């Protein structure tokens, strides 16, 4: 068995005296592990840092085996990001999120979204909002996507300012007003589909905090609580730095 793909490094662990088990989020083969012989050498260590993108050749005798990787660099982001606390916590949180995906289950759209996020993790003006959007995409990839396209009560697609914590569907201002204390806020940047260059506005810290509150609620309900886990520390630190909460 053999394939060649590109992959984002999301983790590694020691194996034997000189090797590592490398965990990649690949474009076409999903989250995939493999043994890298000599992965702990001085030559290999800089390449195998989380956040880097590699060209990987995976080989195994059987499809279900761990197999081994031969890797070469494509984009080495780790050295660029290591000077930013926001980026370091962002890489840690992104890796934790991607590990929620079933192993070897392809998610090419999530892979591409992760690459966009990695490219901007050291830009505090946009990285937090991109992370909120990635969390929404991950929820959808896990089968817990939110419907923010129209009001759950009226079917209208304007003045959407709330999300129902029960259904995960958007609610308009008028329909939600009597129940506003029981609804989650839907910040403008999550309901606006405009892209940079066509009237897009960078969300402020308040909007981003509301976005993280929204995604955090559903991640807790559907992901962390069923696994008896707390909110990852990397997420808490990233949110604090990204929204001006020291």
Curated annotation (Swiss-Prot):
It comes from the Bacteria. Keywords: DNA damage, DNA recombination, DNA repair. Pfam families: RecO_C (PF02565), RecO_N (PF11967). The keyword tRNA processing does not apply. GO terms for biological process: DNA recombination; double-strand break repair. Gene3D superfamilies: Nucleic acid-binding proteins, Recombination protein O, C-terminal domain. One of its GO terms (cellular component) is bacterial nucleoid. InterPro entries: ARFGAP/RecO, DNA_rep/recomb_RecO_N, NA-bd_OB-fold, RecO, RecO_C. Belongs to the RecO family. NCBIfam families: reco (TIGR00613). Involved in DNA repair and RecF pathway recombination. This is DNA repair protein RecO.
